[in-house]
Amino acid sequence: MKKCFYILFLFLSMPLWAQAQTRRASIPLQHGAHRIGNRTDADMERWRQHGLGQFIHWGVYAIPGGFWEGKCYPGAAEWIRSWKEMPKDAYDSLYKQFNPTSFDAKAWAKQARQMGANYMIFTTKHHDGFCLWPSKYTDYTIAHTPYKKDVVKQIVDAYTAEGIDVHLYFSIIDWNHKGYRPAPPETRQDSIAYETFKEFTRNQLIELLTDYPAIKGLWFDGSWDKA
């Protein structure tokens, strides 16, 4: 198959940080900053001194690359599933073609070091919900593609070996999860479904923090969503 890489570099970005919490009966939503004022801790000071960084978006959306049935759609390619012209079932089947056999995380990391990057942020999953690590909480992952290998682990290991701090991007929107709601739940059924999504999200975050202990932080996306 034709292999595509959709790589976006974003410099001097600010991440949001997260820590795994112990078990709890319910998971109340909390939005906004958890601290008041400027942080002065060592981790934040290290971040402020990083300067140049690398932000990589990669997923099954690299296969259409912004094109569908011969038409080019302007805008970010990772949003193509939300466009009316592309059937969702067609997009959700793209993972069956995802087989980047030429992917070389060590080469990426080496090039990043050569260009002077001190940190990188990598998409573990975007809004489509496809996971580039073999999450045990969903089948919509790299493990069920022809490629099968854990992309996140390769990235974390390669960049860490080059002395580059790794932060993991995580979308709090997940179009693939049945419990996700784009707006506040209006019915009891919606509330129950959304509670399963919150638990799913928490489990995946703990999974990432547990399986990739070398990472320096998490970058959350999707906080504009009304849910």
Short names for language-model regions:
Residues Q21-A227:
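Mature catalytic domains of secreted/periplasmic carbohydrate-active enzymes
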